[in-house]
Amino acid sequence: WQLRVAAFNVDPESNGNSSRAWKLSPKHTTGTVVPIELVYKQAGTLPREYNLGYYYDSSDAKRIGSNEKVSGRGGHYLLIDQAVWASSASAGRVLHAFGQYSAASEAASPFSKWYGAGMVLYKPLEGRPRDTLALGYGRAVQNPRSRDVQELAAFNAGADYPNLSNAEQLIELSYGYQATPW
C-alpha cells in the first residue's frame, strides 16, 4: 500500500509559456491543486495496481452559466490495471485489462465524468519484447449545466437547438513499437 500526497501551484497564464519552463517561482498563481491517492500494488504472475484518488483545487474558476466564480472544486478517480493472462510459453507476454473512472465538480467543469476501459498485450510478437498492442474505449460525459447553457443561448437567439450529444466517445486500436531498448 502507498499513500501519495502532493501540492501544485495553479498558474494558467504560464502554462505553455516556454520561457517559464524552468522557473520554480510561480508568477501568476491562482491557487493550489492537492491530489491525494491511495495505491494498492501487487507483483507476481498476474500483477495488479489499483489507485483511488481525490483532488482539491483552491483556485477560482468561472461557474458554468453564470458570471460568478466558484472556488474549492474537487473530484475523484479510480484506476485499475490488472494482468489477466500470462503466457507460459513466452516470458513477458502478458495481457492486462484496465479501467478508469473520474468525476469532477459540475460547477465549473465542461465534462463531469470520464470512463475508460481496455486491454493491452505486452510482447505481441516474439521478436518484439517491448512492443504493445492495445484496444481501448473512452467516454467523456458532458456536464448537464453546459448543455443547459448552450440550449438556453440558442433559445434566446431564436436559433435551433444545437445538436448536442450526451458524451464524446472514442475507440482506439494502437500498436506501440519500441525501436530501441531504453
Residue ranges and their predicted role:
Residues 110, 127-181:
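Outer-membrane beta-barrel transmembrane domain signature
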Residues 19-26, 65-68, 102-106, 156-161:
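Extracellular loop and loop/strand-boundary signature of outer-membrane beta-barrel proteins
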Residues 36-40, 78-82, 117-123, 173-177:
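Residues on the lipid-exposed face of transmembrane beta-strands in outer-membrane beta-barrel proteins
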Residues 1, 40-50, 85-95, 123-132, ...:
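Short loop/turn motifs that connect adjacent beta-strands in outer-membrane beta-barrel proteins
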Residues 15-22, 61-67, 108-113, 144-152:
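Outer-membrane beta-barrel translocator domains and adjoining extracellular loop/strand segments
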Residues 3-9, 50-56, 95-103, 117, ...:
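Transmembrane beta-barrel strands of outer-membrane/channel proteins
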Residues 1-37:
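Aromatic- and glycine-enriched pocket-lining scaffold segments that form the walls
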Residues 28-34, 72-78, 111-115, 165-171:
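Residues that define the transmembrane beta-barrel architecture of outer-membrane proteins
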